[in-house]
């Protein structure tokens, strides 16, 4: 038997559409809803569904665990209300599966996020080849109930999906990639920042708590680091290119060589500056070309569509911003952990 837990906060989203699709495939359906609208209650009654419903916000981890308690299936898929299942694939052959997600995008920030979701897919696919997993995307995924219970269920944290994915990887479970779902992303930059504050702090919380275990298993984090944060490639390449200590020293000394002709000193300084600029540009554009060609080829092979013209914006602006947010989040979580302060995200219940 297979169970599907459809998760909602207030609004129904695609719940009824998913109910119809999954019931036709023989799934037991369970609604896990906090502060449900009348529409969610109507859908639950109409189809005679099992449900765990709370008038107050429990926190997603608690809502999921409550649903697992009443699920009878050996395999469970979890689907957020803003996500629509298109196909599932052979998810039962794995201990857990990442369901491939695409974004039905209209705004610029959504279209850029769709490229990011392709990177998520690539990360999960490469990780599965190494029999590893660093995180799951909670919008849609599946897991064997026995595996979930053995791991102790969902834990109380900001990113319960990331934390569960890491535990799967650390304990050697087989995590596959299959199926397809359409999900939503923030349509405005302001909403994107709100989401990314939660994602980055939640991810940093998991990383800091398990740092040593992660570092000891490079196959867990190397695919994630370079595929999910591709702008790091340029940074690494920049470090590997020749960088003359002599030129650095000369650029510091030249301004004080007032006994040399003023114009000659200025031209020498300009030359050194331009050499550094050229060096950095070579690193940036070489890494971009390598990354862009790679994702274009892989997108064709996997039939995943996104706008190629947005790749430069994604690589040089969107992803570096996301990377910086993650770095700041790591610093904040580390300080809070050292000082014993509780980490909270505004508008999010744990």
Which residues are covered by each model-predicted region?
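Short, well-formed alpha-helical segments that are part of the catalytic scaffolds
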Residues: 10-24
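Acidic helix N-cap motif at the loop->helix transition within catalytic regions
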Residues: 15-17, 37-45, 87-88
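A conserved acidic beta->alpha catalytic loop
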Residues: 21, 25, 33-41, 56, ...
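Juxtamembrane C-terminal module of membrane proteins
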Residues: 31, 214-218, 252-350
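Glycine-rich, basic loop-to-helix element that forms the pyrophosphate-binding segment
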Residues: 54-71, 135
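Long helical/loop segments within the catalytic core of UDP-sugar-dependent glycosyltransferases
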Residues: 62-63, 79, 85, 93-150, ...
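Short aromatic/hydrophobic "clamp" motif used to bind/position activated sugar donors
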Residues: 76
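Catalytic donor/gating beta->alpha subdomain of glycosyltransferases that bind UDP-sugars
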Residues: 96-121, 156-160, 165-223, 257-259
């Amino acid at each position: 038997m297979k169970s599907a837990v459809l998760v909602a906060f207030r609004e129904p989203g695609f719940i009824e559409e998913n109910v119809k699709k999954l019931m036709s495939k023989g799934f037991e359906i369970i609604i896990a809803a906090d502060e449900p609208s009348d529409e969610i209650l109507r859908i639950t009654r109409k189809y005679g569904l099992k449900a765990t419903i709370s008038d107050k916000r429990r926190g997603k981890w608690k809502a999921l665990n409550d649903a697992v308690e009443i699920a009878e299936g050996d395999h469970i898929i979890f689907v957020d209300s803003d996500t629509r299942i298109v196909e599932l694939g052979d998810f039962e052959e794995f201990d857990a599966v990442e369901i491939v997600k695409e974004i039905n995008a209209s705004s610029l920030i959504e279209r850029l996020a769709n490229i990011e979701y392709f990177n998520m897919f690539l990360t999960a696919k490469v990780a599965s080849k190494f029999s590893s997993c660093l995180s799951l995307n909670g919008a849609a995924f599946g897991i064997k109930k026995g595996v979930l219970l053995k791991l102790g269920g969902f834990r109380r944290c900001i990113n319960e999906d990331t934390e569960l994915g890491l535990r799967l990887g650390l304990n050697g479970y087989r995590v596959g990639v299959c199926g397809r779902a359409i999900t939503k992303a923030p349509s405005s930059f302001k909403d994107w920042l709100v989401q990314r504050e939660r994602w980055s702090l939640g991810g940093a919380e998991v990383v800091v708590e398990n740092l040593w275990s992660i570092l000891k298993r490079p196959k867990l984090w190397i695919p994630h680091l370079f595929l999910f944060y591709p702008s790091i490639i340029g940074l690494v390449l920049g470090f590997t290119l020749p960088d003359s200590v002599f030129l650095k020293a000369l650029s510091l000394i030249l301004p004080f060589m007032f006994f040399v002709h003023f114009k000659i000193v200025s031209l020498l300084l300009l030359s050194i500056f331009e050499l550094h600029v050229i060096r950095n540009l070579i690193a940036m554009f070489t890494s971009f070309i390598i990354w862009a060609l790679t994702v274009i080829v892989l997108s064709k092979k996997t039939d995943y569509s996104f706008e190629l013209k947005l790749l430069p914006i994604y690589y040089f602006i969107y992803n570096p911003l996301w990377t910086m947010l993650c770095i700041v989040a790591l610093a904040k979580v580390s300080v809070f952990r050292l000082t014993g302060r509780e980490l909270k995200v505004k508008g999010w219940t744990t």
